[in-house]
Amino acid sequence: NFLGTLINLAKKIM
């Protein structure tokens, strides 16, 4: 879902 994508993107940035 959209929220999961945002979290995944944040994890990649960190």
UniProtKB/Swiss-Prot annotation:
Which regions span the lipid bilayer? none
Which terms are listed as keywords in the entry?
Amidation, Amphibian defense peptide, Antibiotic, Antimicrobial, Fungicide, Secreted
Compartments annotated for it: namely: Secreted
| Major location category of this protein | secreted
Any one GO biological process: killing of cells of another organism
Q: Name one GO cellular component term.
A: extracellular region
Q: Does the record bear 4Fe-4S in its keywords?
A: no
* Record has Secreted as a keyword: yes
Q: Which residues carry this modification: Methionine amide?
A: 14
Q: In which tissues is it expressed?
A: Expressed by the skin glands.
Taxonomically, the superkingdom here is Eukaryota
Family the UniProt entry places it in: Belongs to the frog skin active peptide (FSAP) family. Temporin subfamily.
Which function does this protein serve?
Answer: Antibacterial activity against Gram-positive bacterium S.aureus. Weak activity against Gram-negative bacterium E.coli and C.albicans.
Under which name does UniProt file this protein? Temporin-1Lb
Q: What is the lineage of its organism?
A: Eukaryota, Metazoa, Chordata, Craniata, Vertebrata
